[in-house]
């Protein structure tokens, strides 16, 4: 590994085998660097340079590398990230296309046909749903998260002026999930007015 390649790997943070190959490091050389402890294997197919900085959201970066560019952090993980849920997620919840599968117990996959380019924010090497999409998805996933969690998340976000009911409604319409918002509209408005 040349000094230039090493600098590039440090800047990448978590990286895939394909990214290593793009800068001229073969799969075999990568395996050798792992044995020499110059590169750390985070999990299957995801690596990081031992001197690279570990951001707070390293789990999100790894998950997005693992599940590809169309995946995004969502569900309970996104609600917790935005401080809209008290429950600490036991898994990293990921929105993925319907064909994605995972054998790892670390992730909770939400296979969705809703567009994975709407209401998604890209930050520091990972993708996460916006506050509005997190709330709409919570209503959609009410059987897994609970209606109370979804209503509470909407109420907290609106009361703390993180978003508005109008923005949530607009996002629901863009995603084609406005029926979920309509179903819970009275509960949200009632909770806000209290």
Regions found by a protein language model. Give the residues of each.
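Nucleic-acid-binding surface
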Residues: 3-25, 29, 34, 42-194
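Glycine-centered, phosphate/nucleic-acid-interacting loop/turn motifs that mediate DNA/RNA or nucleotide
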Residues: 37
